[in-house]
């Protein structure tokens, strides 16, 4: 049984539509293998080369002044594409983030770079609407439904929101216990012991059986992200 690598992703932007000149100002992506966070993540604030509208600032609290010395998207594009590799992207309201990411990639004007395909992304907003018709589907609402602690989320933040979405996604797909049962079964089938993920070998990931220590690190990683973001 092979391991399932997924990337939980979120972005913050200067506005609602890249066609209006809006850009990405923050990317947060977290690696999850068999529904367990590995601790590997990709996070950058980005200089959008434009002003920050007040409407956007009210949502995420990221100012134009703060972003002045941050890298441009083209300087981190290759690292971003290497991090997500061919893994499934898990996004809340995927069309929004994919639209902005593809706009940024298209600005690079590099033929070898393939744009992201929306149909290959897992949209947790669509999942929630299907599972709970008539309910509220915001990330905050889903955190409340699944008792995910989002008390530190006064403002939006890409890495912080990706960490919360990771917990919500696990619940949407059967819950933590379901994920652990899958890992135990995989470990028995393959007779493999736990191996730490190597940042240079994420394309060939070993099956992971989570230990008590790893589960504690999983919780500590989420706590650290929510406090720092």
Swiss-Prot record:
InterPro entries from the UniProt entry: DnaQ, DnaQ_proteo, Exonuclease_RNaseT/DNA_pol3, RNaseH-like_sf, RNaseH_sf
Binding-site residues for a divalent metal cation 2, renumbered to this chain: 10
SMART domains in alphabetical order: EXOIII
Active site: 156
Domain of life where this protein originates: Bacteria
Listed cofactors: Mg(2+); Mn(2+)
GO biological process, one term: DNA replication proofreading
NCBIfam families: dnaq, dnaQ_proteo, PRK05711.1
Chain residues that bind substrate: 10, 12, 55, 60, 161
UniProt GO cellular component terms: cytosol
Quaternary structure (record): DNA polymerase III contains a core (composed of alpha, epsilon and theta chains) that associates with a tau subunit. This core dimerizes to form the POLIII' complex. PolIII' associates with the gamma complex (composed of gamma, delta, delta', psi and chi chains) and with the beta chain to form the complete DNA polymerase III complex.
List of residues binding a divalent metal cation 1: 10, 12, 161
Protein name: DNA polymerase III subunit epsilon
Cited function: DNA polymerase III is a complex, multichain enzyme responsible for most of the replicative synthesis in bacteria. The epsilon subunit contain the editing function and is a proofreading 3'-5' exonuclease.
Species whose genome carries this gene: Rickettsia bellii (strain RML369-C)
Catalyses which reaction(s): DNA(n) + a 2'-deoxyribonucleoside 5'-triphosphate = DNA(n+1) + diphosphate
Keyword Manganese attributed: yes
Name of the encoding gene: dnaQ
Recorded GO MF terms: 3'-5' exonuclease activity; DNA binding; DNA-directed DNA polymerase activity; metal ion binding
EC numbers, comma separated: 2.7.7.7
Note describing how the cofactor binds: Binds 2 divalent metal cations. Magnesium or manganese.
Keyword Nucleotidyltransferase appears in the UniProt entry: yes
Keywords, alphabetical: DNA replication, DNA-directed DNA polymerase, Exonuclease, Hydrolase, Magnesium, Manganese, Metal-binding, Nuclease, Nucleotidyltransferase, Transferase
């Amino acid at each position: 049984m092979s391991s399932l690598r997924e990337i939980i992703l979120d972005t913050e932007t200067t506005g609602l539509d890249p066609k209006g000149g809006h850009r990405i100002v923050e990317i947060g992506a977290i690696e999850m293998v068999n529904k367990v966070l590995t601790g590997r993540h990709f996070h950058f604030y980005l200089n959008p080369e434009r002003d920050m509208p007040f409407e956007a600032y009210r949502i995420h609290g990221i100012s134009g002044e703060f972003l002045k010395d941050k890298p441009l998207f083209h300087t981190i594009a290759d690292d971003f594409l290497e991090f997500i590799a061919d893994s499934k992207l898990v996004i809340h309201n995927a069309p929004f983030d994919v639209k902005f990411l593809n706009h940024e990639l298209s600005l690079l004007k590099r033929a070898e770079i393939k744009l992201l395909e929306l149909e290959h992304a897992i949209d947790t907003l669509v999942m929630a609407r299907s599972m709970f018709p008539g309910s509220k589907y915001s990330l905050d609402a889903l955190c409340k439904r699944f008792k995910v602690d989002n008390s530190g989320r006064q403002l939006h933040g890409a890495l912080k929101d990706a960490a919360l979405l990771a917990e919500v996604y696990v619940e949407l797909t059967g819950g933590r216990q379901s994920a652990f049962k899958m890992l135990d079964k995989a470990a028995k089938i393959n007779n493999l012991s736990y191996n730490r993920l190597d940042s240079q070998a994420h394309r060939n990931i070993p099956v992971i059986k989570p230990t008590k220590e790893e589960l504690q690190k999983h919780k500590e990683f989420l706590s650290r992200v929510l406090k720092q973001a």
